[in-house]
Curated annotation (Swiss-Prot):
To E.coli YihF and H.influenzae HI_1236. Homodimer. InterPro entries: DUF945. The keyword Cell inner membrane applies. The gene is ydgA. It comes from Escherichia coli (strain K12). It is found in: Cell inner membrane. Pfam families: DUF945. GO terms for cellular component: plasma membrane. One of its GO terms (molecular function) is protein homodimerization activity. The keyword Cell inner membrane applies. Keywords: Cell inner membrane, Cell membrane, Membrane, Signal. It is a peripheral membrane protein. This is Protein YdgA.
Length: 502
């Protein structure tokens, strides 16, 4: 048989397979749209219930090799959102290349069969216009996603450079590249990426020009949805440099910032152990080197169901605040109410007897390092039925024990206070002299009130508590006696003489 005829037959056969496969995949996507939108709304309700937003779709057009549709994000009917007004929506254009070999993936030489390849861009409308203005009329971002037949997805997110300038306000952003992966149910998610630089110019409440810049922002993390409805996993965020300037003069320079958080499930997935690590390699204020710091905070034995209840109550209360314009439009009042909501829900977290550990919170300069180490064992007050009769009984309802130790090398403290004095305008010699006096005075006062000790040129405080008893720097006393050390003595105010009778 003629080889040319064979080749033509193969090409025709492949075309039939391709067309049939692409059409089937297009129909499959259509049948999954409702489920995908429902899952998106369920995820949105879980992660940001206070947003009062929902996702929907419109203008679906299915073709043989590709389809188009629009996704809308808008306020839930009858509810308010501070960013999107009723009747408004954020709209995304979705261009879908059908599988099993989407054209967009073939352009990247990706030959792995997949259900679809999707390109997402933002529609320019009343809500999104400010972003388009900052991007000089271009789409501010582009997302290219690959959806496998399993339903898992992988997305490349490209944030475009932004520039905005009006009077004394300016925003400049280099753009960034991020990768988002998710399983079909949205339970397992990972995000990584970086942005090179950013700059914000504004005017503060004192009518001063303020500028904030950052360089080399990186993030990398993953999380899964636990059985009790909350996310656990790992997250890392780092920033090479950030500067804050006022009226053209550099006020602060922060270098080498890194935050790492992780949470693990134990006890058959019912309990969470979490850890937060924060480090700052260098802090300079007005060119004065104040040193470096780090913090390791661990919270263990968190009951998963209790955490979920806390999250639900806190989110419900903060969501209710956003529905009250007199609160939502007043930042100070809103923050006050949010804090109240947090502490009102906090007792729920004590179920499971959590343990809080700080080891360490430290600050270091050229002359030494100060450190605070603390362990706090808590317990569920609901397990105690009797009403407390004393202060110790009240504390013991929630606290099993406390162990804390603070160490401050005198030389380190003196160096730190010297830098502070120089910031206040003192010359080097004067600053050292003043700092020495301040540290010696604080140390002497601490010893006088039995709050600190001085040994090996280090100011130290140690405090332990358990069962109503305090041990302060080795001296035992009751909780009431300890509190009495800080009580103000009663002032003998003479009685006001009676007004003489006329």
């Amino acid at each position: 048989m003629n080889k040319s005829l064979v080749a033509v037959g193969v090409i025709v056969a492949l075309g039939v397979v391709w067309t049939g496969g692409a059409w089937y995949t297009g129909k499959k996507i259509e049948t999954h749209l409702e489920d995908m939108v429902a899952q998106a709304n369920a995820q949105l309700k879980l992660t940001a219930p206070e947003s009062n937003l929902e996702v929907s779709y419109q203008n679906y057009h299915r073709g043989v090799f590709s389809s188009q549709l629009q996704l809308l994000v808008k306020p839930i009917a009858g509810k308010e959102n501070p960013w999107i007004k009723s009747g408004q929506s954020v709209i995304f254009n979705e261009s879908v290349d059908h599988g099993p070999f989407p054209l967009a993936q073939l352009k990247k030489l990706n030959l792995i069969p997949s259900m679809a390849s999707i390109q997402t861009t933002l529609v320019n409308n009343e809500v999104s216009k400010p972003l388009f203005d900052m991007a000089k009329g271009e789409t501010p971002f582009e997302i290219n996603s690959r959806i496998g037949y399993s339903g898992d997805s992988s997305s490349d997110i490209s944030l475009k450079p932004l520039n905005y300038e009006q009077k004394d306000e300016k925003v400049a952003f280099s753009g960034g590249e991020f990768q988002l992966n998710a399983d079909r149910d949205g339970k397992a998610i990972s995000l990584s990426g970086e942005a090179q630089s950013g700059r914000i110019d504004a005017v503060n409440e004192y009518n001063q020009k303020v500028q904030l810049t950052f360089n080399n922002l990186k993030t990398d993390g993953s999380s899964t949805l636990a059985s009790f409805g909350e996310r656990v996993g790992n997250q890392k965020l780092s920033l090479e440099k950030m500067t804050i300037s006022v009226e053209g003069k550099e006020l602060a320079l922060l270098e080498g910032m890194e935050i790492s958080g992780k949470s693990d499930l134990v006890n058959d997935g019912k309990t969470i152990n979490s850890q937060l690590d924060y480090s700052l390699n260098s802090l300079k204020v007005q060119n004065q080197d104040l040193g470096s710091g780090k913090l390791t905070l661990k919270v263990g034995q968190i009951d998963g169901e209790a955490w979920h209840q806390f999250s639900q109550q806190y989110n419900a209360q903060t969501q209710a605040l956003l529905a009250q314009p007199e609160i939502a439009n007043n930042p100070e009042l809103y923050q006050e109410k949010v804090t109240e909501a947090f502490f009102s829900a906090l007792p729920l977290m004590l179920k499971g007897d959590p343990v809080i550990t700080i080891a360490p919170l430290s600050w270091k300069n050229s002359q030494g390092e100060s450190a605070l180490n603390l362990s706090l064992f808590l317990k569920d007050p609901a397990t105690t039925k009797e009403a407390p009769q004393t202060l110790a009984q009240e504390v013991d309802r929630s606290v099993k024990s406390l162990d804390a130790k603070l160490t401050i090398p005198v030389d380190m403290a003196t160096e730190f206070m010297t830098q502070v004095a120089k910031l206040e305008g003192y010359q080097e010699d004067q600053a050292k002299k003043l700092a020495k006096q301040q540290v010696e005075g604080a140390s002497a006062m601490g010893q006088m009130f039995r709050l600190t000790t001085l040994q090996d040129n280090t100011i130290t405080t140690s405090l332990q508590y358990a069962n109503g008893q305090i041990t302060l720097n080795g001296q035992k006393m009751s909780l009431e006696d300890f509190v009495g050390m800080f009580a103000m003595p009663a002032l003998n105010v003479p009685a006001v003489p009676a007004i003489p009778q006329q």
